Amino acid sequence: MNETRKFFNSYASDFDGIYGVKKYLLNYFINQLFRKSMKLRFEKAINYANPIQNKTVLDIGCGPGHYSIALAKMGAEEVLGLDFSDEMISLATKKAESQNLSHICKFMVKDIYDYYPTKKYNYSIMMGFMDYISEPRLLTDKIISLTKDKMFISFPRKNGILAFQRELRYRKRCPLYLYT
């Protein structure tokens, strides 16, 4: 896990750009070409979260807060984003503050395995998170115990050109787990 934490601390700003912040033209085109699935996953998860009004959300591996902030804007009562990357949480917190959503969106530097809430959440989200989990069953069991209504989880596919290029890019950066 330390390798993955280090990777995301160093990659936070670039990762944030995947969701549409146009820093450089080349990155924009790369994101459009190779990361369409991330945009589609985002849109589907947000749509499946309806109705969101008066719901509580736990966003595990929240990264820079894209899902959390979108759900808060749609009317979630409370959103808690967890990530073990200090840099990701810093980005998420700044975004929530800049959009006047910090009363709804809270963010914590926390590993989900070390999180023991006193309540259950209506929805739990783990998007782009299982890619870095070696024991998915342990994690899903924990999330089931924290969730009242719905869980949104993405599992990366093992086959295809996108999976192949990800395996090459991540090989020396951090562990990557793909599923069939």
Please provide the spans of the model-predicted regions.
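Conserved beta-strand signature within the Rossmann-like core of class I S-adenosyl-L-methionine
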Residues: K148-P156
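A short SAM/SAH-binding and catalytic strip from SAM-dependent methyltransferases
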Residues: Y123-S134
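A short glycine-rich, Lys/Arg-flanked "PGG" loop and its adjoining helix->strand segment in the class I
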Residues: R137-D149
